[in-house]
């Protein structure tokens, strides 16, 4: 799906008028174009389904991987910084840090790909909970592992700048699949790494 930049420009111009401002004045003349260009960038992830993102970043390594028999070895990455926009208010979700873990099943994904997946999934109108589910689903497709965990911490503009206005409030969500949801030893290991 392509983003309709021209339609965004027209609607932003309409919003400026609805707000009681003049879209022809010097400071606003190019605003619809700028906003449309910004939306094209910050909502890039909306152009791709989870399957397409999985295909885009489906580069794995198998030859160099030593597989242990216990199948409890874990790949863990944290502090992946992303942003997103809440689908309810279009408010910014910011200071978001994503942690991703998985137990390899014969192949591993490049570390930069994990960060790129998190970034691309964030570039949609989202819920924090869905960001975690989308990342987990994509990682499962690429690695073939059912054992995936995603922990996300972030601040929501809809909580900090409007309504209740509680700045500094952080939301933490977890998405646990496979052994991360059923094996207490694996789950404890994950939380130990996350809080370290």
Curated annotation (Swiss-Prot):
The keyword Glycoprotein does not apply. The gene is folE. Gene3D superfamilies: 1.10.286.10, 3.30.1130.10. One of its GO terms (cellular component) is cytoplasm. PROSITE patterns: GTP_CYCLOHYDROL_1_1 (PS00859). Keywords: GTP-binding, Hydrolase, Metal-binding, Nucleotide-binding, One-carbon metabolism, Zinc. Zn(2+) binds at residues 86, 89, 158. Transmembrane segments: none annotated. NCBIfam families: folE (TIGR00063), PRK09347.1-2 (NF006825), PRK09347.1-3 (NF006826). Homomer. Its EC number is 3.5.4.16. This is GTP cyclohydrolase 1. It comes from Clostridium botulinum (strain Loch Maree / Type A3). GO terms for molecular function: GTP binding; GTP cyclohydrolase I activity; zinc ion binding. Pathway: Cofactor biosynthesis; 7,8-dihydroneopterin triphosphate biosynthesis; 7,8-dihydroneopterin triphosphate from GTP: step 1/1. One of its GO terms (biological process) is one-carbon metabolic process. It catalyses: GTP + H2O = 7,8-dihydroneopterin 3'-triphosphate + formate + H(+). Belongs to the GTP cyclohydrolase I family.
């Amino acid at each position: 799906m392509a983003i309709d930049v021209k339609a965004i420009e027209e609607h932003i111009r309409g919003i400026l008028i609805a707000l009681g401002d003049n879209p022809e004045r010097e400071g606003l003349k190019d605003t619809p174009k700028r906003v449309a260009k910004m939306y094209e960038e910050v909502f890039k992830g909306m152009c791709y389904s989870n399957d397409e993102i999985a295909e885009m970043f489906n580069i794995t390594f198998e030859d160099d991987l030593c597989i242990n028999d216990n199948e409890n070895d874990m790949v863990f990455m944290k502090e992946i910084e992303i942003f997103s926009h809440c689908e309810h208010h279009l408010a910014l979700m910011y200071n978001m840090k994503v942690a991703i873990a998985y137990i390899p099943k014969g192949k591993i994904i490049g570390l930069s790909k994990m960060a790129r997946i998190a970034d691309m999934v964030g570039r949609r109108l989202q819920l924090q909970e869905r960001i975690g589910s989308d990342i987990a689903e994509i990682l499962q497709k690429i690695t073939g592992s059912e054992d995936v965990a995603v922990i996300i911490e972030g601040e929501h503009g809809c909580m900090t700048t409007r309504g209740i206005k509680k700045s500094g409030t952080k939301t933490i969500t977890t998405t646990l699949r496979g052994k991360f949801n059923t094996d207490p030893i694996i789950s404890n290991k994950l939380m130990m790494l996350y809080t370290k």
